[in-house]
Curated annotation (Swiss-Prot):
It comes from Lymnaea stagnalis. This is Conopressin/neurophysin. GO terms for cellular component: extracellular space; secretory granule. It is found in: Secreted. InterPro entries: Neurhyp_horm (IPR000981), Neurhyp_horm_dom_sf (IPR036387), Neurohypophysial_hormone_CS (IPR022423).
Amino acid sequence: MMSSLCGMPLTYLLTAAVLSLSLTDACFIRNCPKGGKRSLDTGMVTSRECMKCGPGGTGQCVGPSICCGQDFGCHVGTAEAAVCQQENDSSTPCLVKGEACGSRDAGNCVADGICCDSESCAVNDRCRDLDGNAQANRGDLIQLIHKLLKVRDYD
């Protein structure tokens, strides 16, 4: 009589338990995706590039009143950022370009040294333009080598 519980055979209960576990999307502390369990369904939601804004349309909308670009930094609450209000009219979320930064990686590096989320911007060392500094350092190094070659009459 131990093989049945409330009139159902134990094999049916075990089968139902295994089936329900295999059909659920669960994550545990170590294997949850960035953003938590609810972000598992983001593959089904399409995203698009955020609207262009700023001088010459070279920036991107980061929030409803924030427009940022590598060439000009960020405009917050200005006429250049006014076009970003239109992002609120879209039902499809937009994808802000830039490396993750800020508290819990909730923002994006949108300009040299600037990290923004949809509400605010802040200076962040993770967003420094390392490629630009590397180019300047290479130029300085080449000039130094050229001067050394002239001093040694190798030129």
